[in-house]
Amino acid sequence: MSYFRIVTARKTTMSTKKKVVVTGGLGYIGSHTVVELMQQGLEVVIIDNLCNSSVHILSQIEEIVGKKPVFYQIDLVDISAVREVFEKEDIDSVIHFAAHLLVNESVVNPLKYYRNNLVSLINLLELMNEFSVQKLLFSSSCTVYGDTKQVPVTEETPVFKASSPYGATKIMGEQIIEDAVNSSPVLKSVLLRYFNPVGAHSSGKIGELSIGKPSHLFPIISQAIESESIFMVFGKDYHTPDGTPVRDYIHVQDLASAHVAALQHMEKSSCSIDAFNIGTGNGFSVLEIIREFENISKKKLKITFEERREGDVEKIWADSNKAKEKLNWTPRFSLEEMVRSCLVWENYRSSRDW
């Protein structure tokens, strides 16, 4: 990859069109970003196939912001259906979240991930070109850095071979976008490389809603605490202070605000493509997260140690100074607030039929 060393100066005029398409907008990060966008006065059009989300989130968004966004239940792989949305709506920009995202599942079923994650992106880029939509904000991931030994990672950290097919789709996605931007006189893109989003909205109305069994650390722990079930820690022999993997956890509302900041940045920047790490810069181990949940919930978690999982990275956390300087963005939420909001959401979610 070129790491975006070639920067093309491009004129950007403030568009009179203010509709933002948010793919995967009923998902975890997507729904929080939709709320943030709407609270900033932007019109949002959601495209989501509901494969890992619920239509009930629409009414939850309405409870928070006072109105429902426009919603289309469409699979992005179906380019004809997506084209109808572009024909009907006056679109200014696209924020692309929709993707399969489970590292372990991608190892077992890689072709599912390559087909969905890459075809959907290519379809969007083709339609953006066809309908002269010039701004794309891409949901990338720290997985593009692979199992790097350089921490904290900066945007200049080499993009290595991915540790999972999911990570590979993010690397390929970034390359596809870079090639599309370099071949276009008008297309601009910002790539946000998230670290580990956690927590839930401060209203308690939206949070991580897994369809089926949860697969991410925070909801698994919160549900295990409430059900008094056993929590499995995968790996205790990593080269970390307590032997368990270390991650940079960022509150989902901080992540949502980074998207709004990036969208505003694209309006005024002459840079054709850029990448930003979005994290807190602090690494916490699995055992440290467990202790925080136990301290706040006043409950003891039953844990067992299992073998390492294929595709898991040993340790990674962000250097987000570039985002702080260029996007004027700073994370606000502490680890304690992340955990508390997760527990509040879990209590709310468990009382609902969905």
Each predicted region: which residue ranges?
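C-terminal substrate-binding subdomain of Rossmann-fold SDR/epimerase-dehydratase oxidoreductases
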Residues: 223-354
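Short-chain dehydrogenase/reductase
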Residues: 114, 163-171, 207, 211-215, ...
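Short, flexible, glycine-rich and Lys/Arg-enriched loop motifs at helix boundaries
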Residues: 55, 195-217, 227-247
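Short, solvent-exposed loop/helix junctions and linker helices
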Residues: 23, 115-118, 211-215, 249-252, ...
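N-terminal Rossmann-like NAD(P)+-binding domain of SDR-like oxidoreductases, especially those catalyzing
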Residues: 4-200
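Pocket-edge positions in alpha/beta enzyme catalytic cores
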Residues: 74, 113, 161, 209, ...
